[in-house]
C-alpha cells in the first residue's frame, strides 16, 4: 500500500501525500500477517509514530488489547472516535492524533476472532477473516483519517509545523512526566468516547 502511494505521488499537495504515506505505513504495519517480518519505516515521521504508538500501548496495554479481534465495523468505530477525539475541546493535539491512529491500528491487528469481552457485549463470533477484508479496511481507514486531518484540521496541522513539527515534538527531550501526560490526556478522551459508543450501540 505504501508503494502504491509512492507510485502515484504528484507533488500537487505534499502535506496530503505525506499524511497518506504516514497513515499507510503505520496501518499497514499493524495489519500485516502474524509472523511477517516487520517492514522498515518508510519515512522519519513513520519511525516516530511507531515509537510513540508503542509507548502509548505499553502504558494502556489492557485497553488496547481488549480491541484485538474487534468483531464490529472498524470503519464506523474509527469515524466516531475521530469525530470525538479530534473535535472535542481543546481540539487536536499530537497526543490525540497518536491515540487515534494507534486505536485504528489496533483494530486492524490479527488478534483473536472475538474476545470474551465482545461475546459478553452481544457480538457474534465471525468466520476467519479474509486477507482482502483487512486490506480493504486498511485502505478505508487511511482515507478516513487522511480526510479528517487534511479537512477541518489541516490549518492546525500546518500551524504545528506539519509532520516535521510532529517529529520535533516527540524527539524533544521533555521530562517523562510531560510526555506521558500528553498521551494520558488523549487516551482519556478516547476512553470516554468508547464508553459512549458502547452505550449508544446497546440502545439502538
UniProtKB/Swiss-Prot annotation:
PTM section of the record: Monoubiquitinated by UBQLN1; results in stabilization of BCL2L10 protein abundance and in relocalization from mitochondria to cytoplasm.
InterPro entries: Bcl-2-like_sf, Bcl-2_BH1-3, Bcl-2_fam, Bcl2-like, Bcl2_BH1_motif_CS, Bcl2_BH2_motif_CS
Location within or outside the cell: Mitochondrion; Nucleus membrane; Endoplasmic reticulum; Cytoplasm, Cytoskeleton, Spindle
Motif BH2 location, chain numbering: 156-167
Required for Ca(2+) binding, as annotated region: 118-133
Coiled coil: none
Motif (BH1): 86-105
Effect on the protein of changing residue 119 to R: Abolishes ubiquitination. No effect on localization to the mitochondria. No effect on interaction with BCL2L11, BIK, BBC3 or PMAIP1
Function per UniProt: Promotes cell survival by suppressing apoptosis induced by BAX but not BAK. Increases binding of AHCYL1/IRBIT to ITPR1. Reduces ITPR1-mediated calcium release from the endoplasmic reticulum cooperatively with AHCYL1/IRBIT under normal cellular conditions. Under apoptotic stress conditions, dissociates from ITPR1 and is displaced from mitochondria-associated endoplasmic reticulum membranes, leading to increased Ca(2+) transfer to mitochondria which promotes apoptosis.
Family: Belongs to the Bcl-2 family.
Entry protein name: Bcl-2-like protein 10
Organism: Homo sapiens
Amino acid at each position: 500500500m505504501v508503494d502504491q502511494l509512492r507510485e502515484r505521488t504528484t507533488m500537487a499537495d505534499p502535506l496530503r501525500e505525506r499524511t497518506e504515506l504516514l497513515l499507510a505505513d503505520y496501518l499497514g504495519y499493524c495489519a500485516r500477517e502474524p509472523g511477517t517480518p516487520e517492514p522498515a519505516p518508510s519515512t522519519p515521521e513513520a519511525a516516530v509514530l511507531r515509537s510513540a504508538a508503542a509507548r502509548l500501548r505499553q502504558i494502556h496495554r489492557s485497553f488496547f488489547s481488549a480491541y484485538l479481534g474487534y468483531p464490529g465495523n472498524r470503519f464506523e468505530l474509527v469515524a466516531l472516535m475521530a469525530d470525538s477525539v479530534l473535535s472535542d475541546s481543546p481540539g487536536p493535539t499530537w497526543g490525540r492524533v497518536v491515540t487515534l491512529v494507534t486505536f485504528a491500528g489496533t483494530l486492524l491487528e490479527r488478534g483473536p476472532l472475538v474476545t470474551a469481552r465482545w461475546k459478553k457485549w452481544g457480538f457474534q463470533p465471525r468466520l476467519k477473516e479474509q486477507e482482502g477484508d483487512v486490506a480493504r479496511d486498511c485502505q478505508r481507514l487511511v482515507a478516513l483519517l487522511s480526510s479528517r486531518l487534511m479537512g477541518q484540521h489541516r490549518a492546525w496541522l500546518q500551524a504545528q509545523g506539519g509532520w516535521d513539527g510532529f517529529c520535533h515534538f516527540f524527539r524533544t527531550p521533555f521530562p517523562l512526566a510531560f510526555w506521558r501526560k500528553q498521551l494520558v490526556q488523549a487516551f482519556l478522551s478516547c476512553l470516554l468516547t468508547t464508553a459512549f459508543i458502547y452505550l449508544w450501540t446497546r440502545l439502538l
